[in-house]
Amino acid sequence: MLDLWYSESHADDTKFSIRVKEHLYSEKTPFQQIDFFKSETFGTFFTLDGYIMMTEKDEFIYHEMITHVPMAVNPKIKKVLIVGGGDGGTSREILRYNTIEKVDMVEIDERVVRLCQKYLTQTSCKLDNDSRLTMHFEDGKEFVKRAETGFYDLILVDSTDPIGPGEGLFTNEFYRDCERILSDDGILINQHESPYYKDYCHEMKRAHSKIKDKFPISMVYQFHMPTYASGHWLFGFASKKYHPLNNLNADSWNSLGLKTKYYNTNLHKGAFALPNYVIDELEKTE
């Protein structure tokens, strides 16, 4: 029997590996290389250009933290833009809120969505059966450029790393358009990379520097993601009005009775308490 392993480079001398039971599918699209694997520990997982995007085992952590943090701060959010998110997990979580009226999901590569609908129904379950969701298969940077000013209450940038198709989602122009199309009390959540390895930390600081120049409130929160580089991952929270701690509406969120596996309002508070080494790196962007 072949001993097959998937390995992802996290640094020049560091790799993360998962033993693979089956290589389910492989395709080169006009945008990127897509692969689906099955493993014992992490279930089915998929990669884009050799980087893990999500696994069945730990996807709930990422998808709960990108959605429930802003929703607990402003429970009146109604119109949401998801940039990226082709696996469907972010849409699944945000559509759990009955108060959400409209979700636009902009994914550059339709094949990601269609293949996740085949191999990862755990996350893609809401993509075709909720009338509030509209999928757009185009470049997110171009979508926000022509979107209506002040239209969205929440933007969730559920993107890949700043290489390949995701590179344009880490630019000044993109963040400027996000600020413009958000309502007066709008919130932007941005995939902020990891603070640990040098190359990832560089991209984290680069993104944070651009965002904090455009929003009066710009903070960073953390979560534990076992299959991402170092396991220590960050989101950026930027807002025109709401502070993620001072305006946390814990009682309101808890009254909804949403069952989560990772997020809770106590964790919400702690997620913004960053280690000193992360604070030091963020201060270097000042």
From Swiss-Prot:
Pathways involved:
Amine and polyamine biosynthesis; spermidine biosynthesis; spermidine from putrescine: step 1/1
Reactions that this protein is recorded to catalyse: S-adenosyl 3-(methylsulfanyl)propylamine + putrescine = S-methyl-5'-thioadenosine + spermidine + H(+)
Record-linked Pfam families: Spermine_synt_N, Spermine_synth
In short, the EC number is: 2.5.1.16
Which InterPro entries is this protein grouped with? PABS, SAM-dependent_MTases_sf, Spermi_synthase, Spermidine_synt_N, Spermidine_synt_N_sf
Residues in the active site? D158 (proton acceptor)
What domain of life does the UniProt record list for this protein's source?
Answer: Bacteria
**CDD domains in alphabetical order:** AdoMet_MTases (cd02440)
Organism of origin = Clostridium acetobutylicum (strain ATCC 824 / DSM 792 / JCM 1419 / IAM 19013 / LMG 5710 / NBRC 13948 / NRRL B-527 / VKM B-1787 / 2291 / W)
- Localization in the cell: Cytoplasm
Show the GO cellular component annotation of the record: cytosol
**Listed GO MF terms:** spermidine synthase activity
Q: Which GO terms describe its biological process?
A: spermidine biosynthetic process
Matches recorded under HAMAP family? Spermidine_synth
**PABS domain mapped to chain residues:** 3-240
* Family as reported in the entry's similarity comment: Belongs to the spermidine/spermine synthase family.
How is the quaternary structure described? Answer: Homodimer or homotetramer.
Q: What does the protein in this record do? A: Catalyzes the irreversible transfer of a propylamine group from the amino donor S-adenosylmethioninamine (decarboxy-AdoMet) to putrescine (1,4-diaminobutane) to yield spermidine.
Mind telling me which Gene3D superfamilies this protein's record contains? Answer: Spermidine synthase, tetramerisation domain, Vaccinia Virus protein VP39
Enumerate the residues binding S-methyl-5'-thioadenosine: Q32, E107, D139, G140, P165
Q: What name has this protein been given in UniProt?
A: Polyamine aminopropyltransferase
| Predominant localisation class | cytoplasm
